[in-house]
Amino acid sequence: MLLLFCICCVFIKLVLAEVNLTFVDYAKLPPNYAELLANLIDQHGLMLFDTADVRIEAYNYLLNSITETNTDTDAYLCQLLTGQYTTDCYIFGDSVYEGPENINPSTRYID
């Protein structure tokens, strides 16, 4: 019984490690972005809010914090949310953005 409990604990730890966002390199993020990410995760690296809400909040934060939106903005957002500094980051899934009249936060990606 104890062995089964230990195996379950190890399994849970491995599963939790998969959703841990602490792999983001804070040193490469501007201080405000790192602070935003730190506020959205708990001490175990688990997201405190619904993923779509976090992504929308992070995107709005970046748009309000940067005077000129460009590919660097998208790359910073991608790094903030995924740890990857790239502009090829489908943050809202793999659906194609159909324009502002058809916004669905669960499927929209950052252009």
Swiss-Prot record:
Keyword Signal: yes
Keyword check for Cell membrane: no
Superkingdom of origin: Eukaryota
Disulfide links within the chain: none
Keywords per UniProt: Glycoprotein, Signal
Glycosylated residues, chain numbering: 20
The protein's name: UPF0321 protein P20C8.02c
Protein source organism: Schizosaccharomyces pombe (strain 972 / ATCC 24843) (Fission yeast)
